């Protein structure tokens, strides 16, 4: 214990093995017998000491909050509050309509999250992030209750993780073709943007063709969302379920379609 320099647990360390992700030898140490909350460190017989670490309730709360706030920082099509986003704050970006590839049809697909390394918005990785966050809500009692992370929707009676996920879901619903039920794969420029701020990327946004990959991922997370959100907003849950069913019908009619490949001069992320 760091507070009083007392030893609270002893044991042997075995099973050392090289971990390429860490770049060093690692071993698992079980100190589940330590029940008192506090700050601790591990000291080896050689005198080597670990970093100090906490034991107690809620030790991952700050990491969880930071993770949700990261998604807020990725929001597209809306102004980011400097009190929340700090250096990442900006005015509303990418507010224009997108053009369906190979046509002159314009479509409103504003909203959603920017992708990891560019300002495109992609259904496939977006759906993966949505599913991970919905599982977090289901598996974590803390996440299921926390409504005070500090996003604009905090305090509305809905867990903040669901508020943040809904921002992406609302965008995904716009990505579904109203007639066929298929889902456009992504909305990006023709090429990756330069190293510029979000509001400075002014390339024409293009909706890449509908894909089974995007449509399948969309159907899955919308079906999941229809269950999770029902206790908070039944009308929204119904919309998610209807969208999932429509996407599923599209997939039944296009079972032989191949995975996604970039078309024309578009070279942004494929997520096939």
Regions found by a protein language model. Give the residues of each.
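Acidic/aromatic-lined carbohydrate-recognition and catalytic surfaces
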Residues: 19-22, 49-65, 144-164
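Ligand-binding face of N-terminal immunoglobulin V-set domains in extracellular IgSF glycoproteins
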Residues: 1-60
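Aromatic- and glycine-enriched glycan-recognition loops and surfaces
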Residues: 29-32, 114-124, 151-170, 203-213, ...
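Glycine- and aromatic-rich loop/turn segments at beta-sheet edges
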Residues: 101-116, 142-149, 176-203, 251-272
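Well-ordered alpha-helical scaffold segments within catalytic/enzyme domains
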Residues: 44, 130-153, 170-175, 217-234
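A conserved hydrophobic secondary-structure block that centers on an alpha-helix together
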Residues: 155, 159, 199-201, 205-250, ...
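Long, well-ordered core segments of solenoidal/helical folds
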Residues: 58-83, 164-180, 241-259
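An acidic-aromatic substrate-binding cleft motif
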Residues: 48-124, 128
């Amino acid at each position: 214990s760091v507070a009083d320099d007392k030893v609270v647990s002893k044991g042997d360390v075995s099973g050392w093995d090289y971990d390429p992700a860490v770049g060093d030898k690692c071993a698992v140490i079980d100190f589940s017998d330590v029940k008192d909350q506090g700050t601790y460190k591990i000291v080896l017989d050689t005198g080597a000491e670990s970093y100090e670490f906490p034991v107690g309730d809620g030790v991952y709360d700050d990491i969880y909050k930071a993770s949700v706030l990261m998604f807020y920082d990725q929001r597209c099509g809306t102004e980011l509050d400097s009190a929340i986003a700090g250096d990442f704050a900006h005015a509303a970006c990418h507010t224009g309509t997108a053009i369906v590839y190979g046509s002159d049809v314009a479509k409103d697909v504003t909203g959603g999250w920017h992708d990891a390394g560019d300002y495109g918005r992609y259904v496939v990785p977006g759906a993966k992030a949505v599913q991970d966050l919905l599982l977090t809500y289901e598996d974590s009692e803390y996440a299921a209750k926390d409504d005070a992370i500090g996003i604009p929707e905090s305090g509305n009676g809905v867990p903040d993780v669901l508020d943040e996920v809904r921002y992406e879901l609302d965008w995904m619903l716009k990505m579904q073709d109203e007639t066929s039920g298929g889902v456009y794969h992504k909305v990006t420029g023709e090429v990756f943007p330069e190293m510029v701020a979000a509001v400075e990327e002014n390339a024409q946004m293009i909706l890449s063709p509908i894909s089974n990959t995007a449509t399948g991922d969309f159907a899955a997370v919308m079906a999941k969302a229809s269950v999770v959100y029902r206790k908070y907003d039944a009308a929204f849950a119904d919309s998610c379920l209807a969208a999932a069913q429509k996407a599923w019908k599209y997939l039944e009619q296009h079972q032989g379609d191949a995975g996604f490949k970039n078309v024309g001069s578009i070279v942004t992320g494929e997520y096939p």
